[in-house]
């Protein structure tokens, strides 16, 4: 154990103070006997051998150069979450793997660049009715996500342009129906630290009809509190399945420092998993009393170990 272990919180150039609500994290860690600092992950002047325990936070630009980001994680002696987990979770194909395990995810059509799909072939993969969402498999936050409706010709054309543009850039594309319950009931995010649920956040969607997402627009937090029993039950089951899967995939047991599970009601008394965030998750630490301290406790416990 180290008396004052160094902790480096990692961000990107555009977010020098981490996520909103995390501004006090340095003080909280210092109060717990840590020696904290904030660094930008791709800053060439940083000596990462002196970084101590690295905690990945607001690296919202990783998707613009995922290979460089993953290469950076490999040089770190100690990083949370681990480099293997970051590798797995930075590509949303992980949802296909979780669905294969029986986890209730939103049904998805996957379009791959190597398929060389024609315009007609892409069009046949559009849903026949209702609203749908187009997003790249490698993305951060709500970047490059479009919401469209099938009944409007111009929107279908816009969706086609987005899909062709992403595929043309060599990016895998996800196409999902838009879950109407998001507008009716909102999304629920369950936040876990060291495997224990900390708090729950109910959000309104940042996606508006007939639009591509604006990275500057974030979900609106409606409520933040302890998870209710139903949401907690589902979140705990998802956490258990995810933990078991990652353990089998990596070949060793691993508990995540932080984990955010995004759920949406399916309209049938259950939930669908929208996303599992283990990389650059906004943990909504300023949304509810105690959340910032909970995260600082979790980091400090590992740093002092």
Residue ranges with predicted function:
Residues 59, 137, 178-179, 191, ...:
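Anionic group-transfer/hydrolysis microenvironments
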Residues 20, 148, 286-289:
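Short, solvent-exposed loop/turn segments at secondary-structure boundaries
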Residues 131, 187, 258-260:
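Extracellular structured ligand-interaction cores
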Residues 196, 210-211, 230-305:
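ATP-dependent carboxylate activation and anion-phosphoryl transfer catalytic cores
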Residues 16-18, 62-64, 141-144, 183-184, ...:
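Short catalytic/ligand-binding loop motif for oxyanion handling, primarily in non-cytosolic enzymes
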Residues 2-11, 74-77, 84-185, 229-232, ...:
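Active-site nucleotide/adenylate-binding loops and adjacent lid/helix of ATP-dependent enzymes
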Residues 152-245, 264, 272:
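Phosphate-binding site of ATP-dependent enzymes
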Residues 5, 12-117:
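Conserved N-proximal alpha/beta basic substrate-recognition cap immediately N-terminal to
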């Amino acid at each position: 154990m180290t008396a004052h272990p160094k902790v480096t919180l990692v961000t990107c150039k555009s977010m020098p103070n981490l996520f909103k609500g995390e501004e006090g994290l340095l003080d909280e860690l210092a109060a717990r006997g840590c020696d904290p600092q904030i660094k930008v992950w791709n800053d060439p002047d940083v000596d990462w051998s002196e970084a101590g325990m690295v905690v990945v936070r607001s690296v919202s630009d990783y998707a613009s150069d995922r290979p460089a980001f993953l290469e950076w994680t490999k040089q770190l002696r100690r990083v949370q979450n681990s480099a293997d987990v970051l590798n797995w979770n930075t590509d949303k194909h992980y949802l296909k793997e979780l669905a294969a395990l029986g986890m209730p995810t939103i049904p998805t059509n996957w379009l791959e660049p190597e398929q060389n799909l024609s315009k007609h072939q892409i069009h046949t993969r559009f849903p026949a009715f209702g609203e749908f969402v187009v997003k790249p498999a490698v993305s951060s936050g709500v970047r490059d996500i479009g919401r469209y409706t099938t009944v409007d010709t111009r929107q279908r054309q816009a969706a086609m342009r987005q899909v062709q543009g992403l595929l043309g850039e060599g990016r895998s594309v996800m196409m999902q129906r838009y879950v109407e319950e998001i507008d009716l009931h909102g999304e629920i995010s369950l936040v876990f630290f060291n495997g224990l649920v900390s708090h729950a956040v109910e959000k309104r969607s940042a996606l508006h009809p007939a639009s591509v997402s604006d990275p500057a627009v974030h979900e609106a937090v409606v409520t933040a509190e302890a998870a209710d029993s139903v949401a907690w039950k589902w979140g705990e089951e998802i956490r258990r399945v995810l933990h078991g899967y990652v353990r089998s995939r990596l070949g060793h047991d691993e508990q995540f420092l932080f984990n955010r599970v995004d759920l949406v009601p399916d309209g049938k008394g259950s939930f669908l998993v929208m996303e599992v965030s283990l990389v650059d998750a906004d943990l909504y630490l300023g949304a509810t009393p105690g959340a910032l301290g909970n995260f600082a406790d979790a980091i400090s416990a590992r740093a002092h170990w």
